[in-house]
Regions:
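Extracytoplasmic/secreted envelope proteins and their assembly/folding machinery
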Residues: 45, 68, 72, 83, ...
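Bacterial N-terminal signal peptides that target proteins for export
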Residues: 2-11
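Secondary-structure end/capping motifs
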Residues: 220-309
Length: 337
């Protein structure tokens, strides 16, 4: 069944306003990952370019630390990263700003152990090989789970593999388990069992989330571009939240997500349900961009320091989070309708 797409309506509404943005030409390179989320749909449809009025060079990365490195070098202006690499980068004072929370991770990341590995409970992890991308949200969740279980991380062989490498290592039988996201997660779950996931670890005191960040110099020079990027993202969240029952394996949105990420379309609906995608009101609340996100970054940084992953924790992470662009996006939406 065809229904009007709110994102396409937004693009039409912004068409005239985008002309003024195009007059201020900007080189825009955006780094994305393979996480399953609604923003992949407007990315596939070219709606970000249409709303902004600029060409975007989209670059795919395997992990947050890779995105951080590209942001630091100036190769990217915008990037999608998790809370753990965000905390690591901002603790080192990388000049970036988180302008939208793109996902609150629940079951979308999980620790899966191989069938036949002999792992039936947390105590069985000792001596086993568990893979995860280092300094990622999954790595943070893995360490948080081990802490909760009072398991010594040094007794577990934790290896640094990106999601594609995890899937390959799993097929070869080189690893006993992995804490990771999709599409690797969807693949390894077919011959393994979930020992815990990010939702449960979050309840134990180590929540994880994902954000879109911008280089501060780019955001200061082109705030309207960042705001329009936020607007398209927020509308994709609203579209999914309002019609999630229609996002089935054979639906067009799910097929687009699968094509961009390499995930099996049959896995996508469940993986989408494994995260929360906050809309504007939630973004601006005290729980997220209104203060909670900065506090969560600080908490993550404290944990990373305990694990000797960062040298020091800043006294205040609020300079690295801004609600301004979501507010501007709200004004653009209202003003152009």
């Amino acid at each position: 069944m065809k229904r009007p797409n709110s994102l396409h309506r937004l693009v039409a509404a912004l068409a005239f306003a985008s002309l003024s943005v195009a007059a201020q030409a900007a080189d825009i390179t955006v780094g994305y990952q393979t996480g399953i989320d609604p923003t992949k749909v407007p990315q596939a449809d070219g709606l970000y370019e249409k709303a902004i009025g600029e060409k975007i060079d989209w670059r795919r990365f395997n992990s947050g630390p890779e995105v951080i490195a590209a942001l630091a070098s100036g190769d990217l202006q915008l990037g999608n990263i998790g809370s753990s690499p965000l905390a690591a980068a901002t603790s080192r004072k990388l000049p970036i700003v988180a302008f939208i929370v793109s996902a609150q991770i629940n079951a979308a990341e999980a620790l899966v152990v191989r069938n036949g590995s002999g792992i039936g409970k947390p105590e069985d992890l000792a001596g086993k090989t568990i893979a995860t991308p280092f300094v990622s949200t999954s790595h943070y969740s893995l360490l948080g789970a081990l802490k909760h279980w009072q398991s010594d991380p040094s007794k577990v062989k934790i290896v640094n593999l990106n999601p594609a490498e995890i899937a390959a290592a799993w097929r070869r039988g080189d690893i006993d388990g992995a804490f990771v996201w999709s599409p690797a997660l969807g693949e390894i779950k077919k011959s393994g069992k979930v020992l815990t996931d990010a939702a449960e670890v979050g309840q134990w005191g180590a929540p994880t989330f994902e954000v879109w960040v911008a280089r501060k110099d780019f955001a200061e020079k082109h705030p309207e571009i960042v705001a329009r990027f936020a607007r398209v993202s927020l509308d994709s969240f609203a579209d999914y939240n309002a019609h999630k029952a229609e996002w089935t394996a054979d639906s067009e949105p799910v097929k687009k997500i699968a094509r961009l990420t390499g995930a099996d379309p049959r896995d996508v609906p469940e993986l989408l349900a494994g995260s929360t995608f906050p809309e504007s009101q939630a973004q601006l609340s005290a729980d997220l961009l209104g203060g909670g996100t900065a506090k969560a970054i600080a908490g993550t940084a404290e944990f990373l320091k305990e694990q000797k992953r960062v040298p020091a924790v800043l006294g205040d992470y609020s300079p690295y989070v801004s609600a301004d662009f979501v507010r501007q996006a709200e004004q653009v939406q209202v003003g152009q309708r």
